[in-house]
Amino acid sequence: MNGKSQSIPEVRFEYSFLLSDQASEGLNNLWGDGTPLHSFEYYTGIAAKYEKWWQPDGDTIVAALCQITGLQFYQNTIDVHVAPWFNAFSSPMVLGVMFKKKDDLIITLTHEIIHRLLTDNTTYDRHYDFLKLWKSMFGEDHAWNTLVHIPVHAFLQELYIDVLDRPDLLELDKKSLESLDAKEYIAAWEYVEKTGYKTITDKIRKHVKEQRSDR
């Protein structure tokens, strides 16, 4: 177990030209309407817009996530790679170019940052079996994608309600998933609502403390 400690990581945004060249071009040819991708300047502008949207509240969000989880990020930088035709994922951290409003970006990026914090931190080994842990906490009858989103959604709700005082973000998050008919994500929210987000986050924090005491 690595005992490395560090401060809040810097979140940096960049248009990933290489990812776009190696993957987005092909995806555009496969799924697009024949319109070519936009220019380098267009996509760097989107990355800059995302950074501008994130900056006013970003450090507050990241610091709060460390506080409410009891975890510290292993890495001191989170590079957010922006490229067309991609949905969001956390490792590496990638965002598409579809966000039109600040709140949509905040919700999605915060979601992915929680994924990163829960699985790449200074408390647990990077190869720790989190699926086994979460099955023991939340049950074995969930779809994989539901299981991994139960802790994410619980901490999102704690952040939205108890830290940011933004219940509107909670509602926007749920409505966006409903509009996409994202059944496994919706099932995770339903579990959180039924169980209670504080029950879930308290259970995770307890395990974090136990994990530290065992080192």
For the regions a protein language model found, what residue spans apply to each?
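Auxiliary, metal-adjacent structural segments of Zn-dependent hydrolase domains
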Residues: 33-91, 158-163
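Metalloprotease/metallohydrolase-associated module, dominated by Zn2+-dependent proteases
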Residues: 67, 132-215
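Soluble non-cytosolic domains of exported or imported proteins
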Residues: 52-59, 103-104, 108, 142-146
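Second-shell loop/turn segments in exported
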Residues: 46-55, 96, 137-143
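Short pre-active-site segment immediately N-terminal to the catalytic Zn-binding motif
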Residues: 93-109
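Short acidic alpha-helical/loop segments enriched in Asp/Glu that coordinate divalent cations
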Residues: 76-81, 120-132, 165-170
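Active-site recognition of the HExxH zinc-binding catalytic motif
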Residues: 107-123
